[in-house]
Amino acid sequence: MLDALETLVLGPARALVMSVEERTRVAYHEGGHAILGLLLPGADPVNRVTIVPHGMALGVTYQRPEDDRHSYSEQYLHARIVGAMGGRAAEEVVFETHTTGAENDMQQATDLARQMVTRWGMSERLGPVTLAPRDGTAGTGLENLGFGGGKPYGSATADAIDAEVQRLLEEAASEATRLLQTHRRELDGLAAALLEHETLDEPAIRRATGLLVIPRVAPVPLRTAVGSNNTAATAR
């Protein structure tokens, strides 16, 4: 059973008829998120995985931090971005195709990567500078001086930001694919268990994957890199 917070985050379960092929794809998609959540250093614990549709999602991987967070480390952000790519990477590894199911995941990853580059000064290329538009200046006459009301930088910097965000996302996607290829057996085991039981809690996830003692992998730096009490639910 889902607890109250999980139900609030995931939304109510809903009845939806899916083909065997689509249901299998959802199982691998969510399995990809969960496997990476088990493997990546700094990732929030994987509390539950389900292929029961909730809200607008066909399946959900639910992760909750063990302690309240008021700032985020680079390692944690790395795990969040790579983990968000896990569903798409699993579909690529298993089915060699992509679907629209990763739209929300990619949006989350893109938003986070852009904040790392523009808000938190975590780009080696751009350096320790905040490039996000500042709030509170609209209507003050400062907009045209670059103080809010738009982008406080030129087109060359905008291009550099886009390039850094793209690099972060491509590196994260490559790492997600590499890890799931390495741990294909664990991915297959988890997908099979999801197809049989639909919803798995943490002990069941560990049994299905054989990852009873989680072998955290060494992080592959994204070469940029931030810092609430934040609950992550990665939905397909």
Where are these regions (language model features)?
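Interdomain coupling/hinge region of P-loop NTPase helicase/AAA+ cores
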Residues: M1-L16
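Soluble catalytic regions of large protease machineries
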Residues: P12, E22-Y28, A34-R236
